[in-house]
Amino acid sequence: MTVIDTSDLEKHTPMMRQYLGLKAAHPDMLLFYRMGDFYELFYDDAKRASEMLGISLTARGKSGGDPIPMAGIPYHAVEGYLAKLVNIGQSVAICEQIGDPATSKGPVERQVVRIVTPGTLTDEALLQEKQDNLLAALYQGKTGFGYATLDISSGRFVVAELPTREALEAELQRTNPAELLYSEDFTDMLLINNMKGIRRRPEWEFDYDTCINLLLNQFGTKDLHGFGITDARLALQAAGCLMQYVKDTQKMALPHINSIVRFNQSESIILDAATRRNLELTQNLSGGRENTLAWVLDNTATPMGSRMLQRWIHEPLRNRQTIQYRHSAVSELIEQDLYQTLHEQLKSLGDIERIMARLALRSARPRDFSRLKQALTLLPEIQQTLAICQQPRLNTLVQLLGEFPEQHDLLERAIVDNPPMLIRDGGVIRTGYNNELDEWRKLSEGASDYLVELEAREKQQTGINTLKVGYNRVHGYYIEVSRLQSDRVPLSYQRRQTLKGTERYITPELKEYEEKVLSSQGKALALEKQLWEQLFDLLLPKLQELQQFATAAAELDILSNFAERAELFNYQCPQMSHDIGINIEAGRHPVVERVSQAAFIANPVALTPQRQMLIVTGPNMGGKSTYMRQVALITLMAHIGCFVPADHAQIGEIDRIFTRIGASDDLASGRSTFMVEMTETANILHNATANSLVLMDEIGRGTSTYDGLALAWSAAEYLAKNVSALTLFATHYFELTQLPELLPSVINVHLDAIEHDDTIAFMHSVQEGAASKSYGLQVAALAGVPASVIKAAKHKLHQLENRDMTLSQQNPTQVSMNLLPPIPEPSLALEKLAQINPDELTPKQALDYLYELKRLSHTNT
């Protein structure tokens, strides 16, 4: 790192003194320092930018006696470079020239006018249109964690109180923030170190009273009771820090952030981090979007609909009424044949949600207002399309769309049909909107007629037939004459520029007209900018209603999308039951059936309190994992309001979905594959309930055969006896197929395969009963394992089977059972003993406990 001597600023040049002062105020950010047509970076900023952006590192003379490392980028290309930087979690402070170079005696006055951080983006060019861009803050307390997220591009502000590390990990994965703020005393850095855009914040920013005042000021309320979050102390501390950061970086009012919502885990099906990862909901195991549930379900018409759909996928509902409202809305859109018309209308809306954020931040561009005008034009058509609907949710959404005739009329009168990108270019305000602007424009636009007239007049008076009148931005207006005829120009012509074959002149008349035209152009542009700012003032009073319009349109987009997916992919409306159980007829995996070249084999599943665990056996590649995942995905799809890939589905009450699927280590945490597997298994055994859906795949394969078998048997038995969760338990330990003989609620099913000689055909069909064998050697042969190895494996297999046969003859019915006896009942006496702290007991209390332990020991015998 370059050490910059700032103790004596007089050593540095005036420009570098200015730079160092601005850099000191933004030490953790790259400072883009405007120099003419470039943004320049110096010292360590230059070195880092050179590495991150692949730009040249040079030097700019010396200051304070030392060379100045420098890198630069053209100002007109800045958005592309900013996109690269924020994508890797880097923040940037943009410093512009705000003074007039003509009147500045020293360095031109400069000021940081914009701060760009990964979590506070609103610029369309920097955002991914189909993904929420969240700023998050995290605070650790004695009772758990406070967590807050803000999407500044929509104003969505959500807080949560999370009791455990596992809950926090799941929430971090669900929200996937672009930038995360955490306090100085946060201890579990292992959890967040691999995340992009993490920012350490001083402890005082999490001060409770300071945070409350910040939130009250933002919402303009006397207290927070109306938001239902007053008891969420840790969450409020996180929210307050987040709010402080946004105010510091945005440097303006934030009227679109007008409410705060508490995320309540009890209102949605809980999915832990492993489950979200294993089910590949919105991100596949490689980090991409292809072949995920969202990839299949998302044919939404608008970016805001796509983002809302991803939130729905990660927050499957438990509220039966809301789920059924969504299902019935989708049904009506199909029955009335409205979904295609609605989809086409919504496609023209654009991203109203993010346009509203830019309106609130006064950073909207002319084309944003043009899109808003188009959206408001379409609004009556959308409402007319849905006018025949009877379904309550659709009727509510039509009302929430609202009516904006005055705002539509304003934009229609004010904005031209195809405006330029930036207001600084002018030509945004429509002719007829403002009389004064029309007058200034008329004066400046009349220049072409005047120049034609002047050229004809001067040609006639001078007799110079090559004479031309023209204009360029550098030299202004001029009269051009070929060099051969330049000796014929009048004395009133003053030479302005000499070119290779021509001379250019100015006359007093042309100079006077130039000043008049340029003045009118400047005044027209200044007035146009003033009228542009007034449009914000006229639209902002309707901001909340316009945000509501965007939210309602996004939900309509999802519902019409669900209808389209159902018709295209032959999905059926699931029946939601209040009973415990899952009954699916001819279910299909929504992703695999779309990417598979062969016809997908549909399979049933029946899980009830009397049939609560299926032991799933069958060959490798037979489809066990696909079968289990499809049950979870169908269940989840039903709970977001989507139709499902099945002939019929009845889905009961579900509180959580757990998965223990796949094998991977966690090198960053120093955890082996087996340790990861056991950690996930422990989480399931501790937290699953009778209303949970549990998928367990190949438990115990990461250790020795007997250890693995013992763990798999015990985990399955515990889930069946102690938890009673609805469970799919896939295994290659055939000993587990004897569990149904001990536990009547456990059932064997298998994925069918047909063996012919040394080949195998996978039928992918689920049948009742246990599989006869695992076909591991046949699968190995298909994978290309050398024939000599397969031959040796067959020989070894026969040896092992003969040994097992000998063992079983000693006790043919009970050998496997005796190896794995049922789990003993927990000892009440030992549990009580574990709760006692002997250092805190009086003699009398110790004697009382001794009698109690004696009594409990008899209870267990």
From Swiss-Prot:
ATP binds at G618, P619, N620, M621, G622, G623, K624, S625. One of its GO terms (cellular component) is cytosol. One of its GO terms (biological process) is mismatch repair. It comes from the Bacteria. Keywords: ATP-binding, DNA damage, DNA repair, DNA-binding, Nucleotide-binding. SUPFAM superfamilies: DNA repair protein MutS, domain I, DNA repair protein MutS, domain II, DNA repair protein MutS, domain III, P-loop containing nucleoside triphosphate hydrolases. This protein is involved in the repair of mismatches in DNA. It is possible that it carries out the mismatch recognition step. This protein has a weak ATPase activity. Belongs to the DNA mismatch repair MutS family. This is DNA mismatch repair protein MutS.
